């Protein structure tokens, strides 16, 4: 599948801009890896060494070329310092659907960065003509992420039983969705 091009202007909202992952984001990756949950959800090892974090950065840099989607650093607009990671994943683009995910480094949580990042990611995602809907899948216990989804304009849907393997176990997830506005 051929993906849409990278945005010429970085998606931005509030205090955050989304930019491609760069080598300088190794420190951000290492900080993310200290959250015990983050390594369970992707390819970043827990308490990653510099070499492991560098390898993760390289993998993220290849996601677009592999046809998976867009892997962004969440960076503060005022100094371009990366405070997290988010992705718009397009494996179901042929059906008009995308999925998104986001994570903020533990030391920068509670500043509204996740909501700003999700808003920027959503606006970008819905600007892609083929994307009609973006879904988030969040574990029911993850109250901060549930609130971020709601602040980002996503509507709570159903509990999807056994939706995703996390840490080697199928987990129930709450589906949140947002749709492209219908033009009259």
Residue ranges with predicted function:
Residues 1-36, 71, 75-184:
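Acyl-donor (CoA/ACP) binding surface of acyl/acetyltransferases
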Residues 33, 42, 64-65:
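Hydrophobic residues in alpha-helical segments
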Residues 37-59, 70-72:
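Conserved GNAT-fold acetyl-CoA-binding loop/helix
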Residues 62-67, 154:
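Short loop/turn motifs at secondary-structure junctions and domain boundaries
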């Amino acid at each position: 599948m051929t993906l849409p091009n990278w945005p010429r202007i970085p998606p931005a909202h509030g205090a955050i801009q989304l930019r491609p992952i760069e080598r300088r984001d190794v420190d951000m990756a290492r900080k993310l890896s200290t959250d015990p949950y983050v390594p369970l959800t992707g390819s970043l090892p827990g308490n990653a060494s510099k070499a492991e974090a560098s390898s993760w950065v390289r993998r993220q840099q290849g996601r677009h070329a592999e046809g998976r989607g867009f892997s962004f650093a969440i960076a503060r607009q005022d100094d371009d310092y990366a405070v997290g990671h988010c992705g718009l994943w397009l494996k179901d683009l042929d059906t008009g659907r995308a999925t998104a995910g986001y994570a903020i480094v533990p030391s920068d949580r509670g500043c509204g960065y996740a909501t700003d990042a999700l808003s920027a990611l959503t606006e970008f995602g819905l600007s892609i003509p083929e994307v009609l809907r973006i879904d988030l899948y969040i574990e029911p216990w993850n109250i901060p992420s549930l609130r971020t989804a709601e602040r980002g304009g996503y509507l709570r849907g159903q509990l999807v039983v056994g939706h995703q393997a996390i840490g080697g176990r199928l987990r129930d997830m709450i589906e949140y969705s947002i749709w492209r506005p219908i033009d009259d």
